[in-house]
């Protein structure tokens, strides 16, 4: 396949298993900045001054790819859910948050940064599956902090086959993709500040028997997105085989879909019991070994599909499972260095790794409550259901920022 001429496309594209931006190879180090649209708003939670500072810091570091939640869904006052919400009820939108998303994309465009925007969430922290099921008449979604994750996961396993829930989501997709930015006058479908539409954050079937319906839903969703926007890339947002009930064939099939342009994987050693909270340093070698095995298997799939791979989430707690600013990050730094080395080594050899987004950006946040986010607190890289500081990289985390800068330099040499 011939490469486009310089400047032929203003959008990030894929050619022969690799990303192109402005006609050149595009390799990157990015981050997860889920709260960007809220920060860009002028209502509750909004802080445009902080947003500009965060974007400027990231830009100075060479971080130019941000993975962002379009918006949260549902009622407010749920302690484990992000607020303010964007979609209050199906088809009822909070214009303040929409303005925040517009502002964010405008500011990113000024800095030649690009966004990966995810539209749904299998987890409770932004509504997602549970929100759509409730409004499809499936009953009240359990709250994991009160009812436990098994009850929640059993409930949302219905989503894969609930056509009414899908239709409500598709209405939302059409609304968002049909939007025009109020500040720039540019339609979202024409905005080069958007790299990719992502179906969801870690979409899962939540049950092996739900996998066929899950695959069909992803195919429908990607086809809808493609029909609405022929300019931007589309991705699933998957964790990898972990998000497919450890069915590797399922992962390969969802990535093979003609409307899916590239593959995603996530890595969470602590969440996946590869590392224990009281042995984070001691368990790092095992976490690294499992990480390499997981990555290698997914790279093999990407080679068969000839599609790029992005390590779109990865994180590691602070030493001794601390959360406060200034606490040690030796284990995290070691894990980041290892993941970065695997990504860069493969990319330098012409492999399918194209980039990575660490989780997540805490930046200039000053958390007030470690154990739980409360309304009025600064947003961090940790959503409302998690301890504030658990996986966040703050502006004061000098050793971690040094590791990130080193990777940025390495990846930019490939451009």
List PLM regions with ranges.
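Active-site mouth of glycoside hydrolases
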Residues: 9-309, 314-414
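Bacterial Sec-dependent N-terminal signal peptides
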Residues: 1-8
């Amino acid at each position: 396949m011939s490469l486009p001429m310089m400047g032929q496309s203003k959008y990030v594209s894929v050619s022969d298993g690799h990303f192109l931006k402005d006609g050149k190879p595009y390799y990157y180090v990015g981050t997860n900045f889920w709260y960007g649209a809220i920060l860009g708003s002028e209502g509750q939670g909004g802080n445009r001054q902080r947003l500009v500072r965060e974007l400027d810091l990231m830009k100075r570091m060479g971080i130019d790819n941000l993975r962002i939640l379009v918006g949260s869904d549902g009622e407010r006052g749920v302690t484990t859910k992000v607020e303010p919400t964007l979609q209050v009820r199906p088809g009822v939108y909070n214009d303040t948050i929409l303005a925040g998303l517009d502002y964010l994309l405008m500011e990113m465009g000024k800095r030649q940064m690009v966004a990966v925007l995810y539209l749904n969430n299998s987890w409770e922290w932004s509504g997602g599956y549970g929100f759509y099921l409730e409004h499809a008449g499936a009953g009240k979604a359990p709250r994991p902090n009160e009812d436990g994750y098994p009850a929640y996961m059993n409930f949302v396993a219905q989503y894969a086959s609930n056509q009414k829930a899908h239709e409500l989501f598709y209405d939302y997709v059409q609304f968002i993709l049909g939007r025009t930015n109020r500040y720039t006058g540019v339609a979202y479908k024409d905005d080069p500040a958007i790299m990719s539409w992502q179906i969801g954050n870690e979409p899962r079937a939540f049950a092996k028997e739900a996998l066929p319906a899950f695959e069909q839903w992803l195919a429908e969703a990607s086809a809808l997105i493609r029909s609405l926007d022929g300019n931007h890339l589309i991705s699933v947002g998957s964790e990898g085989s972990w998000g497919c009930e450890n069915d590797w064939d399922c992962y390969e099939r969802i990535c093979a879909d003609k409307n899916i342009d590239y593959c995603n994987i996530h890595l969470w050693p602590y969440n996946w019991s590869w590392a224990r909270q009281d042995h984070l340093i001691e368990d790092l070698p095992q976490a690294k070994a499992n990480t390499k095995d997981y990555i290698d298997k997914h790279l093999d799939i990407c080679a068969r599909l000839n599609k790029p791979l992005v390590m779109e989430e990865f994180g590691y707690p602070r030493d001794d499972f601390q959360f406060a600013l200034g606490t040690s990050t030796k284990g995290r730094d070691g894990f980041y260095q290892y993941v970065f080395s695997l990504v860069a080594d493969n990319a330098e050899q012409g492999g399918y790794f194209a980039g990575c987004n660490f989780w997540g950006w805490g930046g200039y946040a000053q958390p007030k409550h470690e154990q739980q986010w409360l309304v009025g607190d600064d947003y961090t890289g940790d959503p409302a259901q998690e301890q504030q500081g658990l996986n966040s990289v703050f502006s004061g985390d000098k050793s971690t920022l040094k590791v990130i800068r080193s990777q940025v330099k390495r990846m930019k040499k490939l451009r």
